[in-house]
Regions:
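Gly/Ser/Thr-enriched, mixed-charge loops and adjacent short helices
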Residues: 13, 113-241
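Phosphate-binding and adjacent anionic-ligand microenvironments
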Residues: 245, 283-460
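N-terminal small/polar loop signature for handling phosphorylated ligands or for N-terminal nucleophile
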Residues: 36, 40, 48-112, 200-259
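Short glycine-centered, acidic/aromatic-flanked micro-motifs in structured strand/loop junctions
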Residues: 52-53, 187-189, 260, 341, ...
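Proline/glycine-rich low-complexity loops and linkers
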Residues: 131-165, 169, 260-333, 337-338
Length: 460
């Protein structure tokens, strides 16, 4: 089955059977549930929703299905077209809209698409609201508008530019200093909407852009998740072009990775580390990441004399914790930068601007910058379970075994050792337990993972 319904939206593969894949009927049903929930929540006579999409091949089809379903409910739709996840998040409050829908399956391959749901702040809907929307969809509890009360459709293609203006206006972004450096940068946007947004931002900052896979046609030239094994082309190109560094974004531009001037991975985990280092050097405040993110961020927070706290995995959880501790920057170790000065959402445009500001101020190469940060190495693994095995029982047994260590149970089980940690999480969509480890060397991280895999398998 390739249809996953969750509190943050619905995602699946295009084609196939209803309720097994993301078919037109599933898209309509879920859009109707969201629209019905919004109407009930707002209590307003006229409800407005912003819709934007990445460049996936199925994007236009899904967009038409979703927007005309909302219009059928009597909801006005602002179609901002080819866009990015953070751009839609910024557009919702600018439009004074009641919600937003982002049509993207993020880093999933081209056959996938999804509806991601926003509230009137341009933030992902809460757990409670997501459950209410799922219930409406399950019960087909929709009431469509009569012919005289259908919604209206408007198109507005200016929001990427408006988003860029907001990024450039941030007090910690220093366009003049960046322009003086005359950086040369290679951009891999995996032929999605980052190919529109990132070069446009860089050009405004006086950066010479070398485009690689920047045609927003939805034909991804490699696996779109920005991991080392997928990024051989840009690593090679950075060296060939003698570029200062490379920028990689996923299809909806909420994840950001850098390539050093030597053609090596800066490390997705270190995107947030570098941006936080810059921000904390200018303003003191707390920082937040998720439990599976590198300890390097905690080290940077300590260096600047501020507090670090960890949230459960997932953007909604990180944002909730950031608000609780009034963090000035946060995110996830997969290259997601959340900078509340602009909005509470992962935003690669903000990340690029802060990173360039850091480079302009510090001088030196990107490779030298990376080497200035604490060195940690991660290992990511999983163990397969049968349907009969209860993952919660395994995690409970491991918690009891390591009760003498520092443990956290807000999201699975995380065990912190002196120079390493392990995070065990059950999947909500398949019968597996994920094992994340981090240590001072790759060998130690792999060995720690292997040890925990063996210990859990002994319990099965």
């Amino acid at each position: 089955m390739s249809l996953i319904k969750s509190i943050s939206g619905i995602r699946g593969t295009i084609g196939g059977k209803v309720d097994e894949n993301l078919t037109p009927i599933d898209a309509v049903k879920f859009a109707a549930a969201y629209g019905s929930w919004l109407k009930g929540q707002s209590g307003k006579e006229h409800v407005k929703v912003v819709i934007g999409r990445d460049a996936r091949i199925s994007g236009e089809m899904i967009q038409n299905l979703v927007q005309y379903t909302l219009i059928g409910l009597g909801i006005d739709v602002v179609n901002i077209g080819l866009s990015t996840t953070p751009t839609v998040e910024v557009a919702v409050p600018m439009e004074k809209a009641d919600g937003g829908i982002i049509l993207t399956a993020s880093h999933n391959p081209k056959e996938w698409n999804a509806l991601k749901l926003l509230n009137n702040k341009g933030e992902f809907v809460s757990d409670q609201d997501g459950k209410a929307i799922l219930k409406i969809a399950q019960e087909n509890d929709f009431s469509f508008a009569t012919v005289d009360h259908l919604g209206k459709l408007t198109h507005d293609n200016q929001y990427i530019d408006l988003h860029i203006e907001k990024v450039l206006a941030l007090p910690l972004v220093v366009p003049e200093a960046i322009q003086k450096k005359k950086f040369r940068v290679v951009v891999d946007a995996v032929n999605s909407t980052g190919g529109i947004a990132i070069p446009r931002l860089l050009e405004r900052l006086g950066v010479e852009v070398i485009k690689l896979y920047c045609e927003p046609n939805g034909h991804f030239p490699h696996n779109p998740e920005p991991l080392k094994e997928h990024l051989g082309d840009i690593c090679k190109r950075v060296v060939e072009e003698k570029a200062d560094f490379g920028i990689v974004v996923d299809p909806d531009v909420d994840r950001l990775a850098f390539i050093t001037n030597k053609g090596e991975m800066f490390g997705e985990e270190y995107t947030l580390v570098a941006c936080a280092d810059y921000v904390l050097g200018k303003a003191k405040g707390n920082v937040v990441s998720n439990l599976s993110s590198s300890r390097a961020l905690r080290d940077i927070a300590q260096k600047h004399g501020v507090s670090y706290s960890a949230a459960a995995v997932g953007e909604v959880n990180v944002v909730t914790e950031m608000k609780r501790v009034e963090a000035i920057i946060g995110g996830e170790g997969n290259g997601g930068i959340i900078y509340p000065e602009l909005h509470y959402g992962r935003d690669a445009l903000v990340g690029v601007a802060l990173f360039l500001s850091l480079l302009a101020e510090r001088g030196g190469s990107v490779q030298q910058l990376r080497e200035s940060y604490p060195a940690y190495f991660m290992s990511k693994n999983k163990i397969q379970l049968t349907e009969q095995i209860n993952p919660d029982q395994i995690l409970k047994a491991m918690e009891q075994k390591y009760a003498h260590e520092q443990t956290t149970t807000i999201d699975g089980l995380k065990i912190d050792f002196a120079d390493s940690w392990v995070h065990l999480r059950k999947s909500n969509t398949e019968p597996i337990i994920r094992i994340y480890t981090e240590a001072k060397s790759q060998k130690e991280a792999d060995a720690l993972a292997h040890r925990f895999i063996e210990e859990m398998q002994a319990l099965i």
